[in-house]
Structures are given as structure tokens and as C-alpha cells.
Amino acid sequence: MSVVPVADVLQGRVAVDQEVTVRGWVRTRRDSKAGISFLAVYDGSCFDPVQAVINNSLPNYNEEVLHLTTGCSVVVTGKVVASPGQGQSFEIQATKVEVAGWVEDPDTYPMAAKRHSIEYLREVAHLRPRTNLIGAVARVRHTLAQALHRFFDEQGFFWVSTPLITASDTEGAGEMFRVSTLDLENLPRNDQGRVDFDKDFFGKESFLTVSGQLNGETYACALSKIYTFGPTFRAENSNTSRHLAEFWMLEPEVAFADLEDNARLAEAMLKYVFNAVLEERADDMKFFAERVDKDAIARLERFVSTDFAQVDYTEAVAILERCGKTFENPVFWGVDLSSEHERYLAEEHFKAPVVVKNYPKEIKAFYMRLNEDGKTVAAMDVLAPGIGEIIGGSQREERLDVLDARMAEMGLNKEDYWWYRDLRRYGTVPHSGFGLGFERLIAYVTGVQNVRDVIPFPRTPRNASF
């Protein structure tokens, strides 16, 4: 007798007539007049539960089995048999059922066997992984993360762990969470009356990182190809379906790579991970296509079989201006494209994923390489049908004098970035990279509309529960 995951039973990896033990939670129980109960037991290893067939001859049938309700935890031992019923190929003829944990009050159990609204599930985020929806999201999230690691490993990249606490603002936007151990009731002040951060833990102002990019560049300029993958933080007071205060970012960085290399890497990466989900999580994707977004599977299949289009920002603006469509946000050269503009380009004009490149320098970060025209930078956004921007990246500015000039234009103190500038002083090279918001990727794959529902415990303005 061996303990096996439910997935092994349902997917035929356990021989018929083999005695096994499965451990999990009750999804449903139904009883027949013939003295047989049917337990649907899930353990999270796959989408479907396994059916355990329990005869009333078991010694604890009346006292325990007949009192099992949704959410109770059980250990079921029995033989794997071919299932005569529809819906699954195999079931377990139970010879023993142990109750590991009861649900205290089935009538008030928050995850009772019924469909709950997505808003309600956010209020019980500690229990929502027990639902079909969030369980499927969690498995897809895992598969995407593993596929990203696998892709970069196969491509010869090194994974670099960049710091979560930083004194640098990568985006230059100032929307950062401060990290401090100062006594808020008795803040030290300097001669100018300002908070004296010399007295703080790090001896200077410190923040939670908005990006691992700058640190990642230092390792790319030594190991050639690296990526970072971890949590990042933005103190944007944005209560939208696309924003989180804490989210995960994937950021590759490649030495000796230009913008075209960057675009090719982004395309190869996305197609690789989408194929992985289609192959490895067919059960969960079937659920998303049936219950969340009927186009979920077809969208990914189209994506992986379609070549990316490319267009300069200037031409993209011209396309939008002459398309005849009235947009909520006006279009003109110099404006940052909004989601409606991005989706029009990807869904209606190109009908394919599209890389928009060479944006006006005024709307992009200081580290992006200035183009020869002096007006645009070698930036790119990858736009996906159905969501808009899914990746943002650029070729980095490797020329020290140009980098210093851009910092001055944006009011940044170059001394704060002395170590970043050193990369341009000692063996500088062209290099490129991009950022992928992991939760937006999961939302795109699953069809789930709000990024709060694709991360275990969402952090948003005025919400840091659990």
C-alpha cells in the first residue's frame, strides 16, 4: 500500500487493483439507498477529485462517514478500479476511511459546496485555494513559473537574486514604499528640520524595490545572460483590475544584445511558457475555457502559432489616428499609449501580438538608450490580443555621457547611481532586457479579469489582510 496523489489515480499512473491511500479533503458526499456512499476527494494535485466508493460495512460508516461534509479532511485506503460511471476513468473502492479533521460547523463553513462570487472569495483568501477557480489558478501559476525557469536555464541564463531593499528608484517615478526602523512618534530631525535618515537602520533613505533591473544589469555585465524573478512593490494608489502594490516580476538582462535581440527573446519566452501550460495543465485550462473565458485555450493556441508583428511608435500613432475609431483617450505623438490603443493595434489592426518600439524619450525611463534622432529611445512594449501590454523593455544606455545627460534632464542625482554609472566606465557593452508582470501573465493565460485573483494574498490600497 502506498500513498499517491489523486492525479496519479485519475491519470492512469496507478495499476488497476493496486491498493493505495489518498489523502485530501471532501468536496461532496452522496449516499445511495443501497448503503453505499460516494465521496469526492481532492488533494489539489489536479483539477478533479477522485471518487471513493464506501460500503456501509466499514466499521465507522454510521458514526463518521455519514457525517462527512464539504471541507472535512480524510485518509482513504482502497483498491483502484475502473469506474463504471461517467466523468472519470478510475475510482477507489474504499476499505478504510479515516477522518483527519472535521469542519466545525458545516452550516457556517465559508467554502460550502456552492459557487461563490469572486469578490466574496477575496474576503476569505485563506480558504479560497479550496475552490475550483483558485486551485486551478494556483496550479497554472506554478506551471508558468517553472516553465520560465526552465526556458532561461535551457537558454544558458543564470538566475540572480536581486535585493528587495534598495536606495535606488529604477523607474524614477517616486512611487515607492519606505523601509525604516525610526520611531514614528519621535522622528529625529536635522538642522533643516527634515527627518534625519542618517539615524535610520541603513543610514539613508531606503525603499522596497520597484524593479531588480539595475542590480540585474551588473550581473549581466559579468555573466552575459541573467534573469531575476521575485516580488516588487509599487506605492501607486490605483484600485484597478490591473494593479497590485506587491507583485512578481520576471526580468531578463542580456549583454551584447540590441532591441531586436530583446524582441526575439520575449517572443520565444512567451511561446515556450504558453505551450507548457497547454501541455501540462490541460485539465485546468479546460475549466477556464468552460467557466471563465471560452477563448482561453484558443487564445494561447493562436498566440504560439502566430509570428509577432513589429511597428515603430511613430507609425503606431499614425495607424491609430487614421483608423476612424473614436478613443476615450486622445492619440497624438508623444502620448503614452493607453490600454484601448494597445488592444486596437493587437486585436484589430495587426490581429497578432505586436512589438511597438522606439518611444518618445519623454515618456520613458532614464536608462533607455537614446536613438540617433535624439527624440526617441530604444524601448519596446509587447502587446498581446486580449490584454494589451504584457512586456515592457529596452536596450539600455551604455554611453556614460548620454546616461548622465538623461539623468540631469529627469532631475536625478547621478551620485545616487554611482555604482550603476561604473558599468559604463569599466568595459561598457550594449545590453538589453525587459520586465514581465507575472500576475498579468497569469491573468492573460487563465482569462481571470482581476490580478487580485491570481496572486495568493493581494496587496492593494487599504488592504493588507492575511
Swiss-Prot record:
Cellular compartment(s): Cytoplasm
Location (main, coarse): cytoplasm
Biological-process GO terms, alphabetical: asparaginyl-tRNA aminoacylation
Keywords assigned: Aminoacyl-tRNA synthetase, ATP-binding, Cytoplasm, Ligase, Nucleotide-binding, Protein biosynthesis
Top-rank taxon: Bacteria
Pfam assignment, any one: tRNA_anti-codon
Reactions catalysed according to its record: tRNA(Asn) + L-asparagine + ATP = L-asparaginyl-tRNA(Asn) + AMP + diphosphate + H(+)
Any one Gene Ontology molecular-function term assigned to this protein's record: ATP binding
EC number(s) on file: 6.1.1.22
One Gene Ontology cellular component: cytoplasm
NCBIfam families: asnS, PRK03932.1
Membership in a protein family: Belongs to the class-II aminoacyl-tRNA synthetase family.
Name of the protein this chain belongs to: Asparagine--tRNA ligase
Organism from which the protein derives: Salmonella choleraesuis (strain SC-B67)
Gene of this entry: asnS
